[in-house]
């Protein structure tokens, strides 16, 4: 198996197992304050380091507490990953906040606002484009 494929496979397994551990394995209450989703996992070529990108739904204070809880549980996660994946040496786990979903939501909101403005301007323009009716009088010259 090519080294790149192995790294991808290990990353996919880490993502799956970490998701499972987030639901059933971690007892730290800080982790369960917000809705946590794993968005991506990057594993170094030597399988010694692992970056887990998470999206956390909630207020900024909740996000920071959840991230602290995840970092505190990283040793536990590393041990569990080593045991579950039967790796001689499990990678060091680091969590990173992924703000991609937030940014995407922000862009969608902006597009929606633009669409509403366009509709409003379209209504104003269509009213101004109405032909003005003038009364015409005909004068008979006799």
From Swiss-Prot:
Compositional bias ranges of the Polar residues kind: 123-142
| Entry superkingdom | Bacteria
Which UniProt keywords are listed?
Answer: Cytoplasm, Ribosome biogenesis
Q: Name one GO molecular function term.
A: ribosomal small subunit binding
Compartment(s) where it occurs, according to its Swiss-Prot or TrEMBL record: Cytoplasm
Write down any Gene Ontology CC term.
cytosol
Ranges for region Disordered: 120-142
Among SUPFAM superfamilies, the record links this protein to: Ribosome-binding factor A, RbfA
What InterPro entries does this protein's entry cite? KH_dom-like_a/b, RbfA, RbfA_dom_sf, Ribosome-bd_factorA_CS
Primary localization: cytoplasm
Q: Which Gene3D superfamilies match?
A: 3.30.300.20
**Swiss-Prot/TrEMBL GO biological process terms:** maturation of SSU-rRNA
The entry's family comment says: Belongs to the RbfA family.
Q: What is said about its interaction partners and assembly?
A: Monomer. Binds 30S ribosomal subunits, but not 50S ribosomal subunits or 70S ribosomes.
Function of the protein = One of several proteins that assist in the late maturation steps of the functional core of the 30S ribosomal subunit. Associates with free 30S ribosomal subunits (but not with 30S subunits that are part of 70S ribosomes or polysomes). Required for efficient processing of 16S rRNA. May interact with the 5'-terminal helix region of 16S rRNA.
Q: Specify the protein name.
A: Ribosome-binding factor A
